[in-house]
Amino acid sequence: MRVNITLACTETGDRNYISTKNKRTNPERIELKKYSPRLKKHTLHRETK
């Protein structure tokens, strides 16, 4: 079952990205390095509700 998730920057708190994930294969929260437009660099983004 795929669900929509929001990825928020850990440094600014901005919610920059929306993605989907499979809850059966990835039950834990996702952490990805993505580009933050406000900081103009790549930062860690975590899954939020």
From Swiss-Prot:
PANTHER family: 50S RIBOSOMAL PROTEIN L33, CHLOROPLASTIC, LARGE RIBOSOMAL SUBUNIT PROTEIN BL33C. The keyword Ribonucleoprotein applies. This is Large ribosomal subunit protein bL33B. The lineage of its organism: Bacteria, Bacillati, Bacillota, Bacilli, Bacillales. GO terms for molecular function: structural constituent of ribosome. Keywords: Ribonucleoprotein, Ribosomal protein. GO terms for biological process: translation. It comes from Oceanobacillus iheyensis (strain DSM 14371 / CIP 107618 / JCM 11309 / KCTC 3954 / HTE831). InterPro entries: Ribosomal_bL33 (IPR001705), Ribosomal_bL33_CS (IPR018264), Ribosomal_bL33_sf (IPR038584), Ribosomal_zn-bd (IPR011332). One of its GO terms (cellular component) is cytoplasm.
